[in-house]
Every structure is written in structure tokens, then in C-alpha cells.
């Protein structure tokens, strides 16, 4: 009789432990943040497939290591339609909160996190505000895909010129930057998971309707790895359409050189600077 009772107790204990173990395992699985359906995800903090896609690209480029540095600087030589468009040195916080551009002809543009300034006061540079905000964004784009105010469409699989891509449209919440109505069509190489190219419109100083008549694209033609961080040092610009993708000959190009991370940088606005207002 004692043996039967002990046997029953033993079976009950084993069953209880098994039940607890199953529940604990199930809870751990539920606690994992896994991608779910496209519609913004469900559950406790689970990302959508689109967000997981953007996070995956940032991880491939090593966003965490990029943001671990305080500042980055690089020389840029930018050309459009066979003409020099911009040449000088950008210095910026890795989170883009402050940016400085020093041109080869002695002009300096500074974004101090709130306003844009040009020095010296008598300098004329019609594109100063556009330049200080646009080209640094293109450099840092692979690290900014999940910034506040970003909105992602569903991810699609496409093939262009025998190359397979994951593609999604990036838009922005109202009030983000100077031109929240800009959009990007982001193409990620399925073999490397690096950002290959991004089609875009520029609404700076123009309507969306006008901008959508001439979409362009930036092709990140080459990547260098600095401190385990993938940064593109060679850009090509093309015309683009939804039907054709990139087409025609390049309409512009840029070369980045002397790319380096800096512990400190000076973003002080000089006294002889003038403020550059945002477009209406």
C-alpha cells in the first residue's frame, strides 16, 4: 500500500514539474520579440515585418557601432551633369543632431540642431540649407532607417537586372525635417543585406506633384568597412521610375574620402554668420 501511495505521489510530482516547465518555456517564447504580420505587429512590443526589415539592414551596416562614436567626418567631391556641385568636408554627430560643412572656397554651413547658418555673412550659397541636410543624410541613411517619424510600407521582393532585392517605401510623419513629404523607395541586396540603392523625390522648395515628375536614385556603388561599420564611399545618381528602376547613364556621382570618426568636434556658430531660413 505504501509503495502504491509513493508511486502516485511520484507521478503527480513529475506531472507538476512537466507542466511548470512547459509553461515556463511557453512564456519565454512569448517574451521574445519576433516579427509578426505587416500591420504594425501584435503582442507586447513585437515589431512588424517592415520594421524588422529596416532593423535588419541597420544591423548589417552596424548601426550600434556607428552610434557608439560621437562624430564622423569625410571629404566629399560631388558632381552633377559633368559639373562640380560640391566639394569640401562634412563633420557631423553620428546621430545627425549637429552638422558642419566647410567648402573648399572658404564658406562654412552649420546646423546646430535647430537652425542653419552660413558664414561669412556676405557669402552667397543658394543651396546651403539643402546641402547641409541632404548629403549627410545620404551618407548616414543605412543607420537612420528606424529614426523617429519613419513610416514603412510592406516589404516586396523584386528582381532588377538579374539582381534580387527586398524593397520597401519609406515615408515620414508630418513635421519631420524640412521636407516631410519626401519619400524613398529602398532597395536592399538580398545577398548582402546592404542598402544597394534608394529612389527618392526632393520636395525642397517645390510641390510633391512637381517632385514626383522627376524621381532620382542614389546607388551606393561601393562600401568600405571602417571599425566594422559599412559605409559607402562611392555614389552614383540615376533617373528612376517604378517600371524601369534605375535607367540611363549616371546623372551624377560622389566620392567620399578621408572618412574618420572623431571624439570631439566644434559646431559653434561664428558671430559673422547669417541664418538660412527653411523653404516656405
Please tell me what each predicted stretch does:
Residues 1-5:
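Short, Lys/Arg-enriched N-terminal segments with co-localized hydrophobic residues
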Residues 68-75, 94-100, 161-170, 196-197, ...:
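Short, hydrophobic/aromatic-rich segments at coil-to-beta transitions
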Residues 166-270:
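Gly/Pro-enriched, hydrophobic low-complexity segments
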Residues 7-13:
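Sec-dependent signal peptide recognition
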Residues 18-21:
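C-terminal motif of bacterial Sec signal peptides marking the signal peptidase cleavage site
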Residues 38-39, 45, 51-124, 149, ...:
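N-terminal mature ectodomain segment of secretory-pathway/periplasmic proteins
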Residues 46-50, 117-182, 208-211, 271, ...:
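Flexible, processing/modification-adjacent segments and terminal tails
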Residues 23-25:
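Bacterial signal peptide processing site
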Amino acid at each position: 500500500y505504501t509503495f502504491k501511495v509513493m508511486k502516485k505521489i511520484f507521478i503527480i510530482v513529475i506531472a507538476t514539474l512537466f507542466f511548470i516547465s512547459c509553461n515556463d518555456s511557453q512564456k519565454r517564447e512569448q517574451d521574445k520579440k519576433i516579427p509578426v504580420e505587416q500591420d504594425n505587429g501584435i503582442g507586447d512590443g513585437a515589431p512588424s515585418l517592415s520594421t524588422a526589415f529596416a532593423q535588419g539592414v541597420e544591423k548589417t551596416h552596424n548601426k550600434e557601432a556607428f552610434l557608439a562614436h560621437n562624430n564622423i567626418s569625410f571629404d566629399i567631391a560631388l558632381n552633377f551633369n559633368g559639373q562640380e556641385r560640391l566639394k569640401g568636408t562634412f563633420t557631423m554627430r553620428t546621430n545627425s543632431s549637429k552638422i558642419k560643412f566647410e567648402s573648399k572656397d572658404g564658406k562654412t554651413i552649420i546646423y546646430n540642431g535647430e537652425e542653419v547658418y552660413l558664414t561669412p555673412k556676405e557669402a552667397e550659397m543658394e543651396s546651403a540649407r539643402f546641402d547641409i541636410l541632404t548629403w549627410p543624410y545620404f551618407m548616414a541613411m543605412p543607420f537612420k532607417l528606424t529614426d523617429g517619424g519613419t513610416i514603412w510600407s510592406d516589404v516586396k521582393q523584386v528582381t532588377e537586372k538579374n539582381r534580387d532585392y527586398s524593397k520597401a517605401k519609406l515615408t515620414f510623419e508630418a513635421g519631420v525635417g524640412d521636407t516631410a513629404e519626401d519619400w524613398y523607395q529602398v532597395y536592399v541586396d538580398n545577398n548582402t543585406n546592404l542598402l544597394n540603392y534608394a529612389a527618392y523625390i526632393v520636395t525642397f522648395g517645390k510641390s510633391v506633384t512637381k517632385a514626383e515628375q522627376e524621381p532620382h536614385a542614389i546607388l551606393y556603388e561601393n562600401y568600405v568597412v571602417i571599425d566594422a561599420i559599412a559605409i559607402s564611399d562611392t555614389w552614383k545618381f540615376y533617373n528612376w521610375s517604378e517600371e524601369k528602376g534605375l535607367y540611363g547613364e549616371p546623372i551624377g556621382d560622389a566620392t567620399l574620402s578621408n572618412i574618420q570618426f572623431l571624439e570631439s568636434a566644434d559646431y559653434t556658430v561664428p558671430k559673422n554668420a547669417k541664418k538660412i531660413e527653411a523653404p516656405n
